[in-house]
Amino acid sequence: MHTCRAPFMLHRVMIPPDPIQRFAELFERAKQAIAVDPNAMVVATVGDDGRPSARVVLLKDFDARGFVFYTNHESRKGREARAHPYAALCFYWQPLNEQVRVEGRVERVTDAEADAYFQSRARGSQVGAWASLQSQPLATREELEARVAEVEQKYAGQPVPRPPHWSGFRVVPDRIEFWHAQESRLHDRHVYLREDGGWRTQMLYP
């Protein structure tokens, strides 16, 4: 991470007590500084063999309960999140010299939440959720396009319902770390650990 680092210091007495509120304020700054996909994050899951896998997805919602993303539950990340319900998230906002890491348990969002978000998506994305056998082998692009055409024909002139295999996951955090770049690699790191229904804060060596 090579970047021009502005002077910044957040002493322990200044650490906000609520990591979700701190994330919200930082996320607003990221949206002002980054034109494309400031909500992009790396999601890491783990398979039956203990091998981790990671990919970039988009954060779609967050609140005190956790951080939400949507996907095909038969995709690799969907299968792994259901079988081993823990995940790690990582946001990196280079213009801000900021990184946020989130770790926690994974739970499925409610059907009402998934339905509401699915209906807000562009129709092409709704069709794609039916047509794509996400993470499965694909012989040719034409095969995918044929499946898209089939779904478009099936739902022509009517709303596209949410597929039963498509929903959201909420990562319920028990650890959130904020990192701010400093000169000489002497970065600021503050971790929040969930304890007894609240949060304990701790500074970390860089």
Curated annotation (Swiss-Prot):
PROSITE patterns associated with the record: PYRIDOX_OXIDASE
The protein's name in its UniProt record: Pyridoxine/pyridoxamine 5'-phosphate oxidase
Keywords of the record: Flavoprotein, FMN, Oxidoreductase, Pyridoxine biosynthesis
A Pfam family reported for this protein in Swiss-Prot or TrEMBL: PNP_phzG_C
Gene name of the record: pdxH
Function: Catalyzes the oxidation of either pyridoxine 5'-phosphate (PNP) or pyridoxamine 5'-phosphate (PMP) into pyridoxal 5'-phosphate (PLP).
Family assignment from sequence similarity: Belongs to the pyridoxamine 5'-phosphate oxidase family.
BP term (GO), one: pyridoxine biosynthetic process
EC number: 1.4.3.5
